[in-house]
Amino acid sequence: MPDGAAKPSRILAWLVHAYTATGAVLAFIGAWGVVHGDDRLALGSMFVATIVDATDGALARRARVKEVLPDVDGGRIDDIVDYLTFVFLPMLLLEAAGGLYRFAALPVIAVVLLSSVYGFVAPDAKSSDYFFTGFPSYWNIVVLYLMLFHVSPGMNAAILLALSALVFVRIGWIYPSRTPTLRTLTLLLASAWAVLLVVIIWMWPFPPRAIAIASLLFPVYYIVLSLVLHARRRPFDAAQGRPFVPAQGGPAR
């Protein structure tokens, strides 16, 4: 350790892991809301879980948790709680809210759940140049907007199936807090978007339509920027999870 460098704290590292793990509690709170017909509680818990997920990585790097607690896999904790709060809970909420036809609910949700498992375990799920590969299981956001704009059950099913297919399409989607291109603008827009979502959830089920429409700006920005940057990236070596650099004089594999 360099002279004068602060010694990493085991207590702080454990607190960061505990912070990540609160996502499991938030998943239960959200499920409690679904069971008791409180959609706002369910949506609120998913929103808070998203904030936790957006901030715990930076805290973990600052606390140097991999160095201090090498036997505790924070990434695995993150994956468990993300699957609960980004995938399982949103599907539970959408079904309970009548967002899918009863005959189609189980098969459609099964496709979402199973495709998302692959999305979490794929070797190139996160690249070294800070992209997610394949649709990154933003089901919490998808379900919020399907419910917010009262999309029909048939269209809901079509959207869920289409996005499930995109899990397997190796398109890179930006990692909002880490992709360097336009990072400052992305974080500013994401922060403004978060404020709008707080208003929407607080006023649920009747938020002002103007706010609902304005909140679409960031998702549209996210999709457009992801597609533009993906088109500019070099060929991607999925097996190694990094941009593939072909041997001199030889074709890219």
What are these regions (language model features)?
Residues 1-3, 132-253:
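C-terminal membrane-associated helical module and adjoining short loops/tails
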Residues 4-65:
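Active-site-proximal cofactor/substrate-binding loop regions of enzyme domains
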Residues 8-18, 72-80, 125-133, 176-184:
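Short, amphipathic, aromatic/basic-enriched membrane-interface segments that mark the entry/exit
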Residues 16-21, 62-119:
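Multi-pass membrane catalytic core of lipid/isoprenoid biosynthesis enzymes
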Residues 20-33, 52-57, 81-86, 130-138, ...:
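Hydrophobic alpha-helical transmembrane segments
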Residues 29-46, 80, 84, 88-109, ...:
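Helix-coil boundary and interhelical linker segments in multi-pass alpha-helical membrane proteins
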Residues 58-67, 115-130, 168-177, 224-231:
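C-terminal ends of transmembrane helices
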